[in-house]
């Protein structure tokens, strides 16, 4: 099992190109199931989760060609409507095949999902919405089985804002008979990116980017070409890395407008951030100021940046509160940050972070995707060497992170378990 070894204390400088968004690429790959014609994608990140999704789609009969950030998918010969436990357990986003399969083929059998162990994240909103559209759904032996001759348009009000739920129901609705209205829809840019691809495939969707999506169902979708949006969480992670380690870095292929909640807090911490249409420059030459924040749905501060910003707060002047409102059990990185010398206490869904002048390198363990990123950020600032175990979590969501950091001047190397 690979590990990362990071020697702290080196400021970052140079340029980094932000990869395509994982959380946009995964539903967009699933959307290829909605058409018998080819879908051509660009700016697809090379991540473990993407490879897992492509493997799942391939097992279903989708013909796939991929390389150099491009993926072409042809779902004209799909012959397997099952997403097995072996695939789904490693990646929760596998649930996103449910809506497209039921909408186009009238049947799907999908194992209950896994992924990061950060809370229950139930799929009941997906099921409730599909049932409102006329699907018959049973759950037994660990599988969700859904059947429908043709889905019918419906008004769906989700009990909570759910990103994957919105995406699944949106993909189901585009081939349903009549009008579907999704109220309380997630407004995340990745949902909007999926919607733009669906429109390019012939779907009729109004309200993209709002919490009310109105879909007029069509009989079939055609092929399309689409470029995946930049990954705002990868961009935010690099911004926090520079803020912690110090330095002067320019990010390319980024959308500053979808990062405003993060950049606002970085400026509050004393970081200098400049931005253009598709670039950002971040500079830091001092110890950051502690920043209190709470996570919430887009456009508020993203839960996927909570751990990285907490790592920044560990070496800040002052004390900060971090309130996590989206997921329970998303403070698993706290124990590992404290091993590096951080001073963090937890009370329910709130973490109290008292900044320290210096962290010290130690052996730590990644517990989930964003937690692993927080440990990398802390290690860049720590005195001495930090060894991060279980970095397969990092590989699920970051495209060549150690390569990009090394190019910026960080001392990072990947070692196999036998070398560590």
From Swiss-Prot:
Keywords: Cell cycle, Cell division, Cell shape, Cell wall biogenesis/degradation, Cytoplasm, Peptidoglycan synthesis, Pyruvate, Transferase. It catalyses: phosphoenolpyruvate + UDP-N-acetyl-alpha-D-glucosamine = UDP-N-acetyl-3-O-(1-carboxyvinyl)-alpha-D-glucosamine + phosphate. Pathway: Cell wall biogenesis; peptidoglycan biosynthesis. The active site is at 116 (proton donor). UDP-N-acetyl-alpha-D-glucosamine binds at residues 92, 121-125, 304, 326. Belongs to the EPSP synthase family. MurA subfamily. This is UDP-N-acetylglucosamine 1-carboxyvinyltransferase. The lineage of its organism: Bacteria, Pseudomonadati, Pseudomonadota, Betaproteobacteria, Burkholderiales.
